[in-house]
Amino acid sequence: MKVVLSIAGSDSSGGAGIQADLKTMTAHKVYGMTAITALTAQNTTGVTDIMEASPEFLGEQIEACLSDIPCDAAKIGMLPSAEQVKVVHEKLTKYKVKNLVVDPVMVATSGSSLMKDTTADVMARLLFPISRVITPNIPEAQALTGLTIKSRKDMEKAAEELGNESGCAVLLKGGHSIEDASDVLYENGKFTWFEGKRIESSNTHGTGCTLSSAIASNLALGYELPDAIKRAKEYISDAIAAGLDLGKGSGPLDHMVNI
């Protein structure tokens, strides 16, 4: 069985973070492991508190996993501090982890901040260069590049800038665009667009976590990056369309929609 490691935060309501990752991995028939970066008191309406794992304990979790069970892919989600980023880089480099998918989580669906101001720069310097692909949304790409993104051409420009600076592939997600839900992949100087219809649903809690873990799962299964993204987008579209009407805010996806 293929193995995927998720390095991310815990969502007490189960819709995002490692809980969404494990559900997604199970739906893809891969074995999921986790290293928890933070505990969040969170529900469909927002994040009320965050308790970070110490960098040392985060490192111990990754060491415990990878020293015993090698992984075929990994995904990184919420990393609140630069110190955590450094530990993650050290461990992933030590174990030569391949097929790394980095979702540079800065803000929750509800709007709550999940990353300290200096962390993004350290992440870009240490983790992006060892990644197979990074998956920023439009607000995250704007924060990382300083560019304003209002069109497809702007998306291509931002993805190209991020890709050239980091040396990895970039999947810039267009779900925050006013146009549609299409995403653009920049890899090796080429753009590939993945067209997607906007699904009218208020139940979108954990979409970024789910997409990145679906991509990692498909990479672990041996699919090339464009195919892994295509399959992941098909999965998440189904999961959003079947979204669960739970809670008072943005409800979760149905991760088991195809099972």
Residue map of PLM features:
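Conserved N-terminal subdomain of the carbohydrate kinase-like
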Residues: 1-6, 25-109
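Short pre-catalytic strand/loop immediately N-terminal to key active-site residues, enriched for Gly-Thr
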Residues: 7-13, 191-205
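N-terminal basic/disordered segments at the start of proteins
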Residues: 14-30
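Short, small-residue alpha-helix embedded
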Residues: 19, 142-143, 201-225
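Phosphate-handling active-site elements
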Residues: 29-33, 192, 218-231
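Charged C-terminal helix
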Residues: 52, 226-259
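Nucleotide and nucleotide-moiety/phosphate-recognizing core
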Residues: 86-95, 168, 182, 190, ...
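Conserved phosphate/ATP/ADP-binding segment of small-molecule kinases
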Residues: 117-191
